[in-house]
From Swiss-Prot:
Protein name from the UniProt record: Aquaporin-3
Gene Ontology BP terms: cellular response to hypoxia; establishment of localization in cell; glycerol transmembrane transport; odontogenesis; polyol transmembrane transport; positive regulation of immune system process; renal water absorption; response to ischemia
UniProt intramembrane annotation: 79-92, 211-224
Species, as recorded: Rattus norvegicus (Rat)
Residue ranges the record marks as coiled coil: none
UniProt keyword list: Cell membrane, Glycoprotein, Membrane, Repeat, Transmembrane, Transmembrane helix, Transport
Family: Belongs to the MIP/aquaporin (TC 1.A.8) family.
Record keyword Nucleus present: no
Summary of subunit composition and partner proteins: Homotetramer; each monomer provides an independent glycerol/water pore. Could also exist in other oligomeric states.
């Protein structure tokens, strides 16, 4: 037992990454992988069973709890943004350095890509059998929607853009309230569960139009995977070239959420003098102003 523990400690020392930003990027990658693996896995179960093994509520529950678990896994290392829109908002508020935006975004997109790959491997036989050994993007036998979001038939581009903007703005407003130490603070340790509840509420109230991506990495990573895995370029052209909406609109929505929260809440809170220069407003009790 003692020798095994010593060996494990040595391996841990050898594998330890000293560059903090790289450690944080790895945590974002794993956290987003967990989010997509559980979230898209629930969609796969519903779609491939044609509704006999779940439904709209189970999908939203899975995504909500997936966010909670991802924050618990990655939060202490990176803050568990899991979403370029969240990272963008934090950088815009000067709570994170701008260098983190491209690095976190790349890590989150890679994690989403890998999470989609795991779901594809897990349901490989079922996906191929679903449409008679074909990979169909849309329609009654479509399976690309397991991985990325697509607009409903009634939805036009303008309404879809607004849908993603409002969903992301709502997410950011709630996240900022949760991590704001001067507002009603969430009890220590419950931040992850509260953010998961926010995602669940957004899904059950705003998921009908286009599946509430509200996360560029969660949508683009799996979409890119499906393009490479056999669904082809149609995943980008379907829905009047819908693919760019879940990327651009959430980023704009994140800024909208920042302005709404700051103008209506954040700027008016009584703020006692901070004990340190750092702001303790991360989802997992980490300091925002860190040395990279």
């Amino acid at each position: 037992m003692g020798r095994q523990k010593e060996l494990m400690n040595r391996c841990g020392e050898m594998l330890h990454i000293r560059y903090r930003l790289l450690r944080q990027a790895l945590a974002e990658c794993l956290g987003t992988l967990i989010l997509v693996m559980f979230g898209c896995g629930s969609v796969a179960q519903v779609v491939l069973s044609r509704g006999t093994h779940g439904g709209f509520l189970t999908i939203n529950l899975a995504f909500g709890f997936a966010v909670t678990l991802a924050i618990l896994v990655a939060g202490q290392v990176s803050g568990a943004h899991l979403n370029p829109a969240v990272t963008f908002a934090m950088c815009f508020l000067a709570r994170e350095p701008w260098i983190k935006l491209p690095i976190y975004t790349l890590a989150q997109t890679l994690g989403a890509f890998l999470g989609a790959g795991i779901v594809f491997g897990l349901y490989y036989d079922a996906i191929w059998a679903f449409a008679g050994n074909e990979l169909v993007v849309s329609g009654p036998n479509g399976t690309a929607g397991i991985f990325a979001t697509y607009p409903s038939g009634h939805l036009d581009m303008v309404n879809g853009f607004f849908d993603q903007f409002i969903g992301t703005a709502a997410l950011i407003v709630c996240v900022l309230a949760i991590v704001d130490p001067y507002n009603n603070p969430v009890p220590r340790g419950l931040e992850a569960f509260t953010v998961g509840l926010v995602v669940l509420v957004i899904g059950t109230s705003m998921g009908f139009n286009s599946g509430y991506a509200v996360n560029p990495a969660r949508d683009f990573g799996p979409r890119l995977f499906t393009a490479l895995a056999g669904w082809g370029s149609e995943v980008f052209t379907t829905g009047q070239n819908w693919w760019w909406v879940p990327i651009v609109s959430p980023l704009l929505g994140s800024i909208g959420g920042v302005f709404v929260y700051q103008l209506m809440i954040g700027c008016h809170l009584e703020q006692p003098p901070p004990s340190t220069e750092a702001e303790n407003v991360k989802l997992a009790h980490m300091k925002h102003k860190e040395q990279i």
